[in-house]
Amino acid sequence: MSKQIEFNETARRAMEAGVDKLADAVKVTLGPRGRHVVLAKSFGGPQVTNDGVTIAREIDLEDPYENLGAQLVKSVATKTNDVAGDGTTTATVLAQALVRAGLRNVAAGANPIALGSGISKAADAVSEALLASATPVDDKKAIAQVATVSSRDEQVGELVGEAMTKVGHDGVVTVEESSTLETYLEVTEGVGFDKGFLSAYFVTDFDSQEAVLEDALVLLHRDKISSLPDLLPLLEKVAEAGKPLLIVAEDVEGEALSTLVVNAIRKTLKAVAVKAPFFGDRRKAFLDDLAIVTGGQVVNPDVGLLLREVGLEVLGSARRVVVNKDSTVIVDGGGTAEAIADRVKQIKSEIETTDSDWDREKLQERLAKLAGGVAVIKVGAATETDLKKRKEAVEDAVAAAKAAVEEGIVTGGGAALVQARSAVEKLRGELSGDEALGVDVFASALSAPLYWIATNAGLDGSVVVNKVSELPKGQGFNAATLEFGDLVSAGVVDPAKVTRSAVLNAASVARMILTTETAVVDKPADEDEHGHGHHHGHAH
């Protein structure tokens, strides 16, 4: 396909126009008095949202050069969302301000490389200053405040605070759609995993389509179970004990599965077979976790434990097991608190030593399952459109709360960024030339989020920025009440991680755009065809 090429200022200006279009669409949502954006969907009704990354993802511009700029700023929003789960609008507004001021300086003759270097150094200095000034978060009230600011909804803030408090810092908080109008919290104490029963005949509660086992024994097997002679001796012992049985194995098939099904239909033995989740080493590790939670052993021929020879002593136990077609939850396993604490310690040390992000994430999931249980926030609303919007807000609030627990909180309302200028001024004294100019560009951009929070609240942004820059740390402009004062005690706080991610990602993308000298895009198809039609045999 033929390409079009633009150079120098023309390329940068076109990209800036794209940055502006995307950022202008996103920044109207900033702050407690920000507005909504309506997105047309190719199927279903329109989506109403005030989430920066959701809006950014929908935007593709017609002009290919402008679209390059828009896509680069979109990456700021998505990267910030991936790292911190919130703060996407702040990141977009910062990037726009940096690009605008930076390009002005480049057009006036500044060296873009030195300018970009100054911006990066300033971003690092502000990031460190934010971390240093962050207040740790450990109580329910502070978590609820962060979640309330993120979702603009006190009820959501309370629910997220309660969920995080109940499952602990290592627990899992998920968000699901509720079938009612109510938004409420469900906490599952215990270990859950995403594998359901192997046969619908195991269902004991036909209304909810679940198999519920009370006071159950748990058999954990590393390999497949298919031979009936291997399984039968143990089944007979379990039947004598008169307790229901949960079997978790690589797979249960053939005679073994059909025998369990027949027993379930005849109600002679209540048993449920479930596949162990994951593959390879992760599955082995997870089965070992389950053994510790239930107080049992994993039946494994490699260590001399054969299924046909073992008795009830290798089985774990649980007060309650609930299995549906997609998931299994083991509540109140029979394992000792000491054994579980040791296992948690072991997984934490593995998390610290692993180099792979993927491994770290999976280890954290295992840790959460062991340590805290699972909290589910069920979101309800009157209409489908409202439900989507609320669910998004709750997901952002959960992400913000987790980020706050990780790195602490800073003053909200854009005040922390305006007041972080002192860190930038210190740095400016150490630099000279265009690098120092880059620091100035960054310092001026730091007021952009506060400017737009104030503007969206109907005030003069510049006046508010000047006033906040004179206030002591911890104070700022509360756009919800339109008053200046102590933001921390008023609960207007942001997670340090969210604000830091916004600063670093915005600086990174602004630097890329400032140092761009050439833009190459595909030639529009109709021009191509037009060209081919009239110039047969000519090279393009």
From Swiss-Prot:
It comes from Mycolicibacterium smegmatis (strain ATCC 700084 / mc(2)155) (Mycobacterium smegmatis). The gene is groEL1. It is an enzyme of class 5 (isomerase). This is Chaperonin GroEL 1. InterPro entries: Chaperonin_Cpn60_CS, Cpn60/GroEL, Cpn60/GroEL/TCP-1, GroEL-like_apical_dom_sf, GROEL-like_equatorial_sf, TCP-1-like_intermed_sf. GO terms for cellular component: cytoplasm. Signal peptide: none annotated. Together with its co-chaperonin GroES, plays an essential role in assisting protein folding. The GroEL-GroES system forms a nano-cage that allows encapsulation of the non-native substrate proteins and provides a physical environment optimized to promote and accelerate protein folding. Disulfide bonds: none annotated. NCBIfam families: GroEL, PRK00013.1, PRK12849.1, PRK12850.1, PRK12851.1. GO terms for molecular function: ATP binding; ATP-dependent protein folding chaperone; isomerase activity; unfolded protein binding.
